[in-house]
Curated annotation (Swiss-Prot):
Broad EC category: lyase
EC number per UniProt: 4.3.3.7
Subcellular location: Cytoplasm
Pathway: Amino-acid biosynthesis; L-lysine biosynthesis via DAP pathway; (S)-tetrahydrodipicolinate from L-aspartate: step 3/4
Keyword entries, A-Z: Amino-acid biosynthesis, Cytoplasm, Diaminopimelate biosynthesis, Lyase, Lysine biosynthesis, Schiff base
Gene Ontology CC annotations of this record: cytosol
SMART domains from the UniProt entry: DHDPS
Positions of the catalytic residues: 133 (proton donor/acceptor), 161 (schiff-base intermediate with substrate)
A GO term for molecular function: 4-hydroxy-tetrahydrodipicolinate synthase activity
Protein known as: 4-hydroxy-tetrahydrodipicolinate synthase
Entry keyword annotation includes Calcium: no
GO biological process: diaminopimelate biosynthetic process; lysine biosynthetic process via diaminopimelate
Catalytic activity: L-aspartate 4-semialdehyde + pyruvate = (2S,4S)-4-hydroxy-2,3,4,5-tetrahydrodipicolinate + H2O + H(+)
Organism, scientific name: Nitrosomonas eutropha (strain DSM 101675 / C91 / Nm57)
């Protein structure tokens, strides 16, 4: 079971939109040095909707090869086609990823039974630990707690990233899942609350900008040091909110670029952060102790 702070890592790109693998590898080193507990590659924050199959495979293989066992690599493999999701999951398995993160199918609006059959088919087709990803604000499809509990009985499905931000719902889930099934927060602003209610970790956007603080907050919360966890979260809270002033990953790419780690380049239909929001993000970074 993975525990702690897992960064939903950005995908660096060159001016022409090509992948910047040199900076990608440098980011992996940065997160290892900063204490990040795991890396999610090609998730929402990694611009998965605009990364093609070959690039997807390349990013996962590069991450696994370069990390070389120094940090767990979790591969984003979701798609709104079950067949494509299986293919992406096969990529991850063959590349040697430690687990996959599979988002609920978006746009085609499956029923709860459709969601169950989708994830069941992937788990039965590919032998790799699978973390479900529920983010109805993006997908429209919402994996209910009851469906999650059904899926938790399937071998290979080991956890869920709950990005609903609904604490009551997360608390209900934590209390009812099997002991070998992990619940991860996918919403930085409410992550501490879920951790204190029994969650196992975070898959975080903020960790791109403040990886050591996110690791320390998770460690404090999971060890019962409430005062320390609350103090760190207070420093980070403005980042948690303001990194979503525009669609993720627009603001976080700007922030990581200002740290000198990547170029701000982003693929259409996403565009660079509006200048009116630059100072907002800068102030949030300064509040967290990040000099820009």
């Amino acid at each position: 079971m993975f525990r702690g702070s897992h960064v939903a890592i950005v995908t660096p790109m060159l001016e022409d939109g090509a992948l910047d693998l040199d900076r990608f590898c440098a980011l992996i080193d940065f997160h290892i040095e900063q204490g990040t507990d795991g890396i999610v590659v090609v998730g929402t924050t990694g611009e998965s909707p605009t990364v093609d199959f070959d690039e997807h495979d390349l990013l996962i293989r590069t991450a696994v090869s370069y990390a070389d066992g120094r940090i767990p690599i979790i591969a984003g493999t979701g798609a709104n086609s079950t067949r494509e999701a299986i293919e992406l999951t096969v990529f991850s398995k063959n590349a040697g990823a430690d687990a996959c993160l599979s988002v609920a199918p978006y746009y085609n609006k499956p029923t709860q039974e459709g969601l169950y059959q989708h994830f069941k088919a992937i788990a039965e087709a590919v032998d790799i630990p699978m973390i479900l990803y529920n983010v109805p604000g993006r997908t429209v499809a919402d994996i209910s707690n009851e469906t999650t509990l059904r899926l938790a009985q399937i071998p290979g499905i080991v956890g869920i990233k709950d990005a609903t931000g609904n604490i009551a719902r997360g608390c209900d889930l934590v209390q009812r899942v099997p002991d070998n099934f992990a619940v991860y927060s996918g919403d930085d602003a409410t992550a501490l609350a879920l951790l204190l209610l029994g969650g196992h970790g975070i898959i975080s956007v903020t960790a791109n900008v403040a990886p050591r603080l996110m690791h320390e907050m998770c460690t404090a919360a999971l060890s019962g040091d409430l005062a320390q966890a609350r103090a760190i979260n207070a420093r980070l809270f403005k980042l948690h909110i303001d990194l979503f002033v525009e669609a993720n990953p627009i603001p976080v790419k700007w922030a990581v670029a200002k740290m000198g780690l990547i170029n701000e380049n982003i693929r259409l239909p996403l565009t660079a952060l509006s200048s009116q929001h630059h100072e907002l993000i800068r102030k949030a970074m300064l509040q967290a102790g990040i000099t820009v």
